[in-house]
A protein has these predicted regions:
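Short amphipathic alpha helix immediately N-terminal
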Residues: 53-70
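N-terminal interaction/assembly modules
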Residues: 1-53, 73-74, 79-80, 85, ...
């Protein structure tokens, strides 16, 4: 048969034990970040700055990962990043995210 290109399944929120932030906070950060494009300009700037601080030279990959439903594998391939590098950036981002943005 012909090869079918696997359609990216939208990501779902999953609690990550590796991130020392509560389930509720992780959910808040996850969904707030996904709503990036609907947030006020000032909040968008805060999120972008958090990505720059946490992702450093890989901030564009981190930004794409937290503000879209692109999967980790796709983001890593696109930005030539190892999964562990992205994981560390995501952990820093979650740890630095303010209580209320």
């Amino acid at each position: 048969g012909g090869k079918h290109k696997r359609k990216e399944v939208p990501r779902v929120f999953r609690y990550k034990k590796s991130i020392p932030v509560s389930y509720e906070r992780q959910g808040y950060i996850y969904f707030t970040s996904l709503l990036y494009w609907e947030l006020p300009k000032r909040t968008q700037e805060k999120i972008l700055n958090l990505c720059i601080a946490a992702g450093k030279e890989n901030y564009q990959a981190l930004f794409e990962f937290v503000t879209t439903d692109a999967g980790a594998q796709a983001v890593c391939l696109r930005h030539h990043l190892s999964p562990s590098t992205l994981e560390r950036a995501v952990r820093r981002y979650y740890e630095a995210f303010p209580r209320k943005i």
